[in-house]
């Protein structure tokens, strides 16, 4: 069987559907192994392929994650796409090319943004899913800062 590393985050219940994926890979003669992306003991060059799957904690150290991704041999996910998609500023590019996006305003840390008089969401530009995101009402501008 061909060894393939499936990069993930350390922790329980990170990949609840891993057993199904593992079985599907095995059916294709692939020895899928979950490997924590920032575990220095992993020998990445021992795998025919490395696939990023559930590296949710990259948000705490994007620079370290990008450095790791730039050095991993046989990485299936292309580095320029990883770098681009790990920061939500790509949404501005999508909008500039005519794609509709949720109304978005980007702010730097320390900015005092103007919030809408309707419900709104604040989330980090480097984030995974709803991590560190929250929704606010029109009377919660101070809390949103």
Over which residues does each language-model region extend?
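ATP-binding N-terminal substructure of ATP-dependent carboxylate-amine bond-forming enzymes
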Residues: 1-76, 81, 89
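Active-site nucleotide/adenylate-binding loops and adjacent lid/helix of ATP-dependent enzymes
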Residues: 1-8, 68-145
């Amino acid at each position: 069987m061909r060894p393939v590393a499936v990069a993930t985050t350390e922790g329980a219940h990170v990949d609840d559907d891993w057993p199904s994926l593992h079985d599907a890979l095995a059916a294709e003669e692939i020895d899928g192994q979950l490997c924590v992306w920032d575990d220095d003991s992993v020998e990445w060059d021992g795998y025919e392929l490395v696939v990023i799957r559930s590296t949710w904690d990259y948000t705490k150290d994007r620079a370290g994650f990008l450095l790791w991704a730039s050095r991993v041999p046989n990485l299936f996910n292309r580095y320029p796409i990883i770098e681009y998609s790990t920061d939500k500023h790509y949404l501005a590019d999508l909008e500039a090319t005519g794609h509709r996006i949720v109304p978005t305003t980007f702010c730097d840390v320390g900015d005092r943004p103007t919030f809408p008089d309707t419900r709104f969401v604040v989330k980090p530009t480097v984030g995974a899913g709803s991590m560190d995101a929250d929704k606010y009402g029109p009377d919660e501008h101070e809390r949103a800062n």
